[in-house]
Curated annotation (Swiss-Prot):
GO terms for cellular component: plasma membrane; proton-transporting ATP synthase complex. F-type ATPases have 2 components, F(1) - the catalytic core - and F(0) - the membrane proton channel. F(1) has five subunits: alpha(3), beta(3), gamma(1), delta(1), epsilon(1). F(0) has three main subunits: a(1), b(2) and c(10-14). The alpha and beta chains form an alternating ring which encloses part of the gamma chain. F(1) is attached to F(0) by a central stalk formed by the gamma and epsilon chains, while a peripheral stalk is formed by the delta and b chains. It comes from the Bacteria. It is found in: Cell inner membrane. It is a peripheral membrane protein. It comes from Afipia carboxidovorans (strain ATCC 49405 / DSM 1227 / KCTC 32145 / OM5) (Oligotropha carboxidovorans). HAMAP family: ATP_synth_delta_bact. SUPFAM superfamilies: N-terminal domain of the delta subunit of the F1F0-ATP synthase. F(1)F(0) ATP synthase produces ATP from ADP in the presence of a proton or sodium gradient. F-type ATPases consist of two structural domains, F(1) containing the extramembraneous catalytic core and F(0) containing the membrane proton channel, linked together by a central stalk and a peripheral stalk. During catalysis, ATP synthesis in the catalytic domain of F(1) is coupled via a rotary mechanism of the central stalk subunits to proton translocation. This protein is part of the stalk that links CF(0) to CF(1). It either transmits conformational changes from CF(0) to CF(1) or is implicated in proton conduction. Transmembrane segments: none annotated. This is ATP synthase subunit delta. Keywords: ATP synthesis, Cell inner membrane, Cell membrane, CF(1), Hydrogen ion transport, Ion transport, Membrane, Transport. Belongs to the ATPase delta chain family. The lineage of its organism: Bacteria, Pseudomonadati, Pseudomonadota, Alphaproteobacteria, Hyphomicrobiales.
């Protein structure tokens, strides 16, 4: 397995571990990580691609043909492209987001980094991302890789999950706290 204390499980964990070990053996972790990030960005920006990935209506051949076109246009080649094709052929493309998350965790562990899941109401600019990374690095003593998710329902602020710790400074949570306090008071 990848590293003894890195916990990945289930289908996504097995596929992520296979991708990580292949990338490590080929000494191309950085290139594979960049391609994985590029594919994740495509998923985040393209609802049609998400539909293709998640829908059981499409056959493996239809998914494969469409995926080939997407990968070619995005410039994703080599290990990552072949890996995504294997996911497609094995009818596991629906799990690609979990595979990406597990792969990123394996890479972070390998590099001695920590991974934080961050939920924000609006996308963060580079200055804010750098400030958040610096703040989390001061807490953990490690470089921190961010998995940022945009969720407008938190209204403002952010939610950070780092390992077993979570800090919720979202406006939604603060408003709910005020609401409960007012109910108790009156």
């Amino acid at each position: 397995m990848a590293t003894d204390d890195t916990s990945v499980s289930g289908v996504a964990g097995r596929y992520a571990t296979a991708l990580f070990e292949l990338a490590r053996d080929q000494k191309s972790i950085d290139a594979v990580r960049a391609d994985v990030d590029k594919f994740a960005a495509l998923l985040a920006d393209n609802p049609d691609l998400v539909r293709l990935v998640r829908s059981p209506v499409f056959t493996a051949q239809e998914q494969g043909k469409a995926l080939d076109a997407v990968l070619t246009k995005a410039g994703i080649t080599g290990i990552t492209a072949n890996f995504l094709k294997v996911l497609t052929a094995n009818r596991r493309l629906f799990a690609v987001n979990d595979v990406i998350r597990a792969f990123r965790a394996l890479v972070a562990k390998f590099r001695g980094e920590a991974t934080a899941d961050v939920t924000v109401a609006e996308p963060l600019n580079d200055k804010n991302l750098d400030a958040l990374k610096a703040s989390l690095k001061s807490v953990t003593g490690k470089d921190v890789d961010l998995n940022v998710k945009v969720d407008p329902s938190i209204i403002g602020g952010l939610i950070v999950k780092l390992g077993s710790r979570m800090v919720d400074s979202s406006l939604r949570t603060k408003l709910n706290s005020i609401k409960h306090a007012m109910k108790e008071a009156g």
